[in-house]
Amino acid sequence: MASNPVLAIVFSAVLAATAGCASGPPAPPEVPGALQPPAGQALFLEALASGVQIYECAPKADQPSTFEWAFRAPEAALVDRAGRSLGKHYAGPTWESPDGSSVVGEVKGRDPGPDPSAIPWLLLNAKSTSGNGVFTPTKSIQRVRTVAGVAPAEACTAAKAKQIARVPYTAAYYFYRAAP
């Protein structure tokens, strides 16, 4: 799928606008109850993501003669509000820092969010962490403020089997650890 220069400009503008916000500790986002982290956890990191959601045209698991765009993985750069690199986000889902620490999440809550043309908002639990760094204390992760990233609207047919679509998206990820 060809990249869309208009979307690239919009995503860049969104990141630039948030980069100018006041610094200091991030405030927890307002989210529906299903996306609240468990009691006893405190927000410690906000990461702004810009990248793609990767889909593959594949047979449906329960109807192999019918095809659909199946989600495969995210691929995104993570930055703070000042635009400094915090790492990358990829399949797992995994968030990895240049300091070698990483966290792998599993979805625990989902909400469609306010924009039907964007991927849903999520609450994830940390399934595992590795390394000793920024992501090591993570217990929960929220994905909110999503823009775009949904599966292509074009039909997925047998003729397009195994075709890959890389759909641009942005999101904010909030990381929680055990409260002190």
Regions found by a protein language model. Give the residues of each.
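Bacterial N-terminal signal peptides that target proteins for export
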Residues: 1-10
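C-terminal motif of bacterial Sec signal peptides marking the signal peptidase cleavage site
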Residues: 17-20
